Curated annotation (Swiss-Prot):
GO terms for cellular component: mitochondrial matrix. GO terms for biological process: estrogen biosynthetic process; fatty acid biosynthetic process; protein heterotetramerization. It is an enzyme of class 1 (oxidoreductase). The active site is at Y167. The lineage of its organism: Eukaryota, Metazoa, Chordata, Craniata, Vertebrata. It catalyses: a (3R)-3-hydroxyacyl-CoA + NAD(+) = a 3-oxoacyl-CoA + NADH + H(+); 17beta-estradiol + NAD(+) = estrone + NADH + H(+); testosterone + NAD(+) = androst-4-ene-3,17-dione + NADH + H(+); 17beta-hydroxy-5alpha-androstan-3-one + NAD(+) = 5alpha-androstan-3,17-dione + NADH + H(+). This is (3R)-3-hydroxyacyl-CoA dehydrogenase. Pfam families: adh_short_C2. NAD(+) binds at residues 13-21, 40-41, 72-74, 167-171, 200-202. It comes from Sus scrofa (Pig). Heterotetramer with CBR4; contains two molecules of HSD17B8 and CBR4.
Length: 259
């Protein structure tokens, strides 16, 4: 999808921006003209993304608005609240686009999964999105600004997967959370949608054995794994006014897997 500068007046906060889908989303939104606040648990990785965008520390000029990196653990309430405060202090406004990409896996079969691995995945993947969405919504409502909140779920949240009861539950929760938020915030001109990637070539997918990936590819009608830019293109659409009458939707980016 070619850039159309649909977001030239937007400020986008992207969590999980240090790699994979989060980095691709940051690049895509910047190409659309948005200023980008790139957040990651790994602050150095977030800074690398900002440099890639042409922000502070880069030898090239920023292609659009100002860019900045932020370090935060989105699973902690105080940290999530402080993140929004820091972003507003830096850019002098709340983010009008919020994309929650931060996520982890701790895979194990149900019979052997530890409570700690369950709690960690739920804390980042579901609680983290709740906290960031809540803080961003509070900032937008207080300022009277419209916005678009986009939560990265997963097709696994819809169909489940062996060895991923924690991950599947967290991503299913994101879908339900997104729909509830869409109902609550529509009156404030704030939209909320989720994106359900399939198997995407990311650092997380690199942990999957090749023979498993080969089997998955054989199940995909498009015949190949997706790339982070495929997800980022959909996010850019949902962030823009081209999707102005879309809220509460769950958009699958799977190449036809599990349809």
């Amino acid at each position: 999808m070619a850039s159309q500068l649909r977001l030239r007046s937007a400020l986008a906060l992207v969590t999980g921006a240090g790699s994979g889908i989060g980095r691709a989303v940051s690049v895509r939104l910047a190409a659309e003209g948005a200023a980008v606040a790139a957040c990651d648990l790994d602050g150095a990785a977030a800074q690398e993304t900002v440099q890639l965008l042409g922000g502070p520390g880069s030898e090239k000029g920023a292609p659009s608005g100002p860019m900045a990196a932020f370090q935060a653990d989105v699973s902690e309430a105080e940290t999530a609240r402080r993140l929004l405060e820091q972003v507003q202090a830096y850019f002098f406004r709340p983010p009008s686009v919020v994309v929650s990409c931060a996520g982890i896996t701790r895979d194990e079969f149900l019979l052997r999964m530890s409570e700690d691995d369950w709690d960690k995945v739920i804390a980042v993947n579901l609680k983290g999105i709740f906290l960031v969405t809540q803080a961003a919504a509070q900032a937008l409502v207080s300022s009277g600004c419209p916005g678009s909140i986009i939560n990265i779920s997963s097709i696994i949240g819809k169909v489940g997967n062996m060895g991923q009861t924690n991950y599947a539950a967290s991503k299913a929760g994101v879908i339900g959370l997104t729909q509830a938020v869409a109902r609550e915030l529509g009156r404030y001109r704030i939209r909320c949608n989720s994106v359900l990637p399939g198997f995407i070539k990311t650092p997380m997918a690199q942990k999957v054995p090749q023979k498993v990936l080969d089997k998955v590819v054989g199940m995909i009608p498009m015949g190949h794994l997706g790339g982070p830019p495929d997800v980022a293109d959909v996010v850019a659409f949902l962030a823009s006014e081209d999707s102005g009458y879309i809220t509460g939707a769950s958009v699958e980016v799977t190449g036809g897997l599990f349809m």
